[in-house]
Amino acid sequence: MSFSRSFSRLASSKFVLPVAAAAVGLASYSFTSSSFIANEPSKAFKGGDEWIDLKLISSHDLSHDTKHLVFELPNKDDVSGLVTASLLMTKFVTPKGSNVIRPYTPVSDTEQAGTIDFVVKKYEGGKMSSHIHDLKPNDTLSFKGPFVKWKWEPNQFKSIALIGGGTGITPLYQLIHEITKNPADKTQVSLFYGSQTPDDILIKKELDALAAKHKDQVKIVYFVDKADASWKGETGYISKEFLQKNLPAPGPDNKIFVCGPPPLYKAVSGPKVSPTDQGELTGSLAELGFSKENVFKF
């Protein structure tokens, strides 16, 4: 029976007053709900094909080839609209009229209002990374999205291992940050992160702060190719022997996430075929008995 028919029948009975009160209550609930929704932060990015130009607020060096950039969202109270873990597409038009489009993962909190942060490494011959590095404050860059890579749910797994290299740290950092900011999420996190030198370890200050604050939940091991005398981490690549000793056992309660340059994928998990095709699992993880279901490649 529909609500309108039920209401009509009751309106002619001795229950008019209670029903009227209920109707008032319903109207009040509707108003309150609408007010609550209206008070939610507006989202700068809602999906679809619309490109949004964001103004660069600041840009500073993290290393000799990597910058931290902060862009201004359209309104000061806007949040990005992204979830963990997702990315935005970026676009600029060359002098000859060609579109250059590349994906980038923000490193800022999904609830951060007014601005959005990126860590971008400049690659030799990289059109977008070179363009972004040349941007000056008040310049704009076009963005579109979000595009969800893996939607994190609290306590999805008992433990996760994150294997990364270079700027592949960005979605892995998203995961660590999202998990540790939620006291109800008890997921155990291990990060194994490789860089060329100690100075090339990106957002190390932020990573170390999270590990120190959540020392019973987060474990981080850094690897560098070239170490100096003061280096206290691991030297060399992330080997199969290291993974065998430090990864959780294969199983549905554990998940491994991989993100980094092509040599890392080749050695650890095998490459993706495309953004929507994870490809076969090969490399160290396959040799250690993990299956495709145990591993996600960003």
Swiss-Prot record:
Its main location: mitochondrion. It is an enzyme of class 1 (oxidoreductase). FAD binds at residues 156-191. The chain crosses the membrane at residues 15-38. It is found in: Mitochondrion outer membrane. It is a single-pass membrane protein. PROSITE patterns: FAD_FR. It catalyses: 2 Fe(III)-[cytochrome b5] + NADH = 2 Fe(II)-[cytochrome b5] + NAD(+) + H(+). It comes from the Eukaryota. Keywords: FAD, Flavoprotein, Membrane, Mitochondrion, Mitochondrion outer membrane, NAD, Oxidoreductase, Transmembrane, Transmembrane helix. It holds the Pfam family FAD_binding_6. InterPro entries: CBR-like, Cbr1-like_FAD-bd_dom, FAD-bd_FR_type, Flavoprot_Pyr_Nucl_cyt_Rdtase, FNR_nucleotide-bd, OxRdtase_FAD/NAD-bd, Riboflavin_synthase-like_b-brl. The keyword DNA-binding does not apply. One of its GO terms (biological process) is ergosterol biosynthetic process. GO terms for molecular function: cytochrome-b5 reductase activity, acting on NAD(P)H. Belongs to the flavoprotein pyridine nucleotide cytochrome reductase family. May mediate the reduction of outer membrane cytochrome b5. PANTHER family: NADH-CYTOCHROME B5 REDUCTASE, NADH-CYTOCHROME B5 REDUCTASE 2. This is NADH-cytochrome b5 reductase 2. It comes from Scheffersomyces stipitis (strain ATCC 58785 / CBS 6054 / NBRC 10063 / NRRL Y-11545) (Yeast).
